[in-house]
Amino acid sequence: MKVLMVRAKIKDENVADAQAAVEKVIQALDQAQPADVRYASCLLSDGVTFVALLKLEDDGGHPLRELPAYAEMVENLKQWYAEPPDVEQMTVTGSYGLLHDR
């Protein structure tokens, strides 16, 4: 299993656009229902920083890349970033329902 955390500061004028794009991705995931994928996006209290968590299996696949809504969001984010995003791979040391099924 691979878990990625993306922390991205968005320009003030694009926060609503970024939130709408996240909602489109969630809707696309609801429709596609890819197996073994967990995705969450949160807005920090500063109102401009998003933190996304993505859990994928280690087989090298990335089902989100197959979703047009995700591709559109990634392309738009290039213009919406206030600064380069920080992407880190994480090791899960414990999870209750967020990254594993119970």
What function would you assign to each model-found segment?
Residues V6, V87-M90:
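Generic beta-strand hydrophobic packing signal
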Residues K24, A28-R38, L54-E88:
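An amphipathic, aromatic/His-enriched active-site/gating alpha helix that lines ligand/cofactor pockets
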